[in-house]
A protein has these predicted regions:
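Polybasic low-complexity intrinsically disordered regions
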Residues: 40-71, 75-79, 86-215, 219-220, ...
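Short capping/connector residues at structural and topological boundaries
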Residues: 15-18, 22, 28, 32, ...
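General structural signal for alpha-helix termini and helix-helix connectors
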Residues: 79-83, 268-271
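Helix-centered, glycine/charged polyanion-binding patches within enzymatic domains
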Residues: 1-6, 191-264, 272-276
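C-terminal extensions of enzymes
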Residues: 266-301
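Charged, often Cys/His-bearing segments associated with DNA-binding zinc-finger transcription factors
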Residues: 1-45, 58, 87, 98-111, ...
Length: 301
């Protein structure tokens, strides 16, 4: 007897693909009041700020989602407001670039009982591209973004941007400092985090670090290395594959999946040239990914 073969509903399939490109713009009734909520309030020094931070954040989010330069982002914001029948001023590209470094991004969501950490590189555009063309790959440079991912809802709960020379173990402490991790939390990472400094920080915060020990790892009697000694004994008796299975080490692939989604959605390079702006740009992408995983309801008319 032939196996049942499901028939493809091509009409529905084509409609769903078309819906992926649909655009919904919702403008609240209080948009005009929030757009200029500062009302020209004077800052600490210099000229008063005209636009509040959330207006600039809106423009920068549009820039990242649609991969636009800042000037084209300004044109997009003007067009959306014009088509919606709303007459509001739009910040220019210089304002977006200048105030980006001072923006306060939203807090990271709270994690459950486990967080998976990893890092990836983001290329830098600008003068380095010309230097790479002339002098070869030795002049190529990038920035590293370190992320902590909660495996259950696939949300990014920690983020940090460092220069390319920073080792993953050196970013372990400041990365976890950006997350709200309770005592007893489990942190999963690759072999790059098999360092005494990482275990010392995990022991200080009463966290459990799960990382495969090196092939020639030896047991040390320091109290901070208790989890590492336990992992070494388990690997010697069970073997590395069985130890990974008992520790559910395969969850580490979720961090790699988050890196792939980050680059697939926003590209593998950074548009900003200044270091503070590069940090904000990379972390803003992570926050946008979180917003896509936690959609909000739009009130209907």
């Amino acid at each position: 007897m032939n196996a049942f073969k499901q028939k493809m509903h091509w009409k529905k399939y084509n409609r769903e693909l078309a819906d992926r490109g649909s655009l919904t713009v919702y403008l609240g009734d209080d948009l005009a009041s929030k757009w200029a909520s500062n009302n020209g309030a004077a800052a600490d020094r210099g000229r008063p700020e005209v636009y509040p931070d959330h207006v600039l954040l809106l423009g920068l989010v549009l820039q990242q989602v649609y991969r636009l330069p800042l000037r084209q982002t300004v044109g997009l914001m003007r067009s959306v407001l014009k088509l919606s029948g709303v007459a509001l001023p739009v910040p220019d590209s210089s304002t977006l670039s200048r105030r980006r470094r001072h923006l306060v991004l939203p807090h990271w969501p709270k994690s459950g009982r486990c967080v998976v950490i990893d890092s990836t590189g983001l290329q830098i555009r600008g003068p380095n591209t010309w230097l790479t063309t002339v002098h070869g790959r030795k002049r190529r440079t990038h920035r590293k973004i370190h992320l902590g991912v909660d495996p259950d809802p696939s949300l990014i709960v920690a983020g940090l941007v460092t220069p390319c020379q920073t080792h993953d173990s050196e970013a372990f402490d400041p990365l976890l400092a950006t997350a709200e991790l309770p005592a007893g939390h489990e942190v999963i990472g690759d072999g790059a985090y098999d360092r005494r400094c990482c275990y010392a920080y995990a022991s200080k915060r009463r966290l459990r670090l799960v990382t495969p020990p090196r092939s020639r790892a030896v047991i040390h009697l320091q109290p901070d290395l208790t989890d590492r000694n336990r992992a070494i004994r388990a690997v010697r008796s069970l073997g590395t594959p069985e130890w990974k299975r008992t520790q559910h080490y395969a969850r580490r692939s979720l961090a790699e999946a988050a890196m792939h989604r980050l680059k697939a959605a926003f590209g593998a390079g950074l548009r900003s040239r200044l270091w503070p702006n590069q940090q904000k740009e990379a972390l803003l992408r992570a926050h946008i990914l979180n917003s896509w995983n936690t959609p909000k309801r739009i009130p209907s008319d």
